[in-house]
Swiss-Prot record:
Gene Ontology annotations for the cellular component aspect, listed alphabetically: endomembrane system; endoplasmic reticulum lumen
Function recorded in the entry: Dual specificity glycosyltransferase that catalyzes the transfer of glucose and xylose from UDP-glucose and UDP-xylose, respectively, to a serine residue found in the consensus sequence of C-X-S-X-P-C. Specifically targets extracellular EGF repeats of protein such as CRB2, F7, F9 and NOTCH2. Acts as a positive regulator of Notch signaling by mediating O-glucosylation of Notch, leading to regulate muscle development. Notch glucosylation does not affect Notch ligand binding.
Family: Belongs to the glycosyltransferase 90 family.
Name of the protein this chain belongs to: Protein O-glucosyltransferase 1
Annotated stretches, region: Interaction with the consensus sequence C-X-S-X-[PA]-C in peptide substrates: 103-107, 172-178
Keyword ATP-binding: no
Amino acid sequence: MELGVSSQLWLWLLLLLLPPVPGREKESGSKWKVFIDQINRALENYEPCSSPNCSCYHGVIEEDLTPFRGGISRKMMAEVVRRKLGTHYQIIKNRLYRESDCMFPSRCSGVEHFILEVIGRLPDMEMVINVRDYPQVPKWMEPAIPIFSFSKTLEYHDIMYPAWTFWEGGPAVWPIYPMGLGRWDLFREDLVRSAAQWPWKKKNSTAYFRGSRTSPERDPLILLSRKNPKLVDAEYTKNQAWKSMKDTLGKPAAKDVHLVDHCKYKYLFNFRGVAASFRFKHLFLCGSLVFHVGDEWLEFFYPQLKPWVHYIPVKTDLSNVQELLQFVKANDDVAQEIAERGSQFILNHLKMDDITCYWENLLTEYSKFLSYNVTRRKGYDQIVPKILKIEL
């Protein structure tokens, strides 16, 4: 016997009111709702930088210089120089001068390259540039003193500058990078070529990490890899401080792997080292999805990279890492979109011109707070440009 129209309507209403059968919900709508909602909120609140130059980062310069708006006196600068917290530089009549001491000559050389690129447009000034890994001006220090450092946490007043590694002086990795990481312009080209060879659909879906044990925060991922190698391929390599297998958690050190070969993998992990990790910017250019562990350590460009928009944020203790990996595997299109946004940001807003631009803007703004005329110190040598290297 056929049902009447009214009976059919009641039947449909009854079906709509019944609870769903367990296990039949769409994963993106239920199991992964928390992550999907976080991504949607992040995108709603995100304002892309459309500027063609480094003005995307101007807010970082303003914030870093805020403690010194009362002025930097000759007496304050003399005290900063005396304390040997960094290398003392002077710019006078568009020439660069430096004290003879530099703890890491290749790092100083990387810094000097960028200053010399823009020195013709800079006013007279002097500054102390820290080329150690660690920042020097904790916020409890009174008064705050002007020290330039490449990386810091929110607990420091150091003024961030683009690291020397954009040109030279990065950590040496034998045998693949014996001269150290550098030449960001050339690295960009190599990574873009590798990314083209490994489009998203061809990439290995095992999460990947290779690096030395510069921080024990990396340990949980290494241990997870040993437990579940299909989910994560993570191993420790040697560094200059390596003494025994204790430094690689009881296993032989793995071979170092070129950054371009990381592009074979969909999911790449970034950890802090002693301070911020130099690999971070490189990983994005693989077109892979970056898993960024912790949010404490910063470089000047980090604030413009947003969690869930450009990368996947991971808790410092990695307690949520397995769930996050399961999420991206179950939501491949979402993962690819985040990877593409991260890659495009670095391609568009972290070019070599942006680095040079940031140096010029930073030093120009900083010079406005010096309340005295700079005079050249005796015994300081003039720094002149070096011959350009054209390949890695």
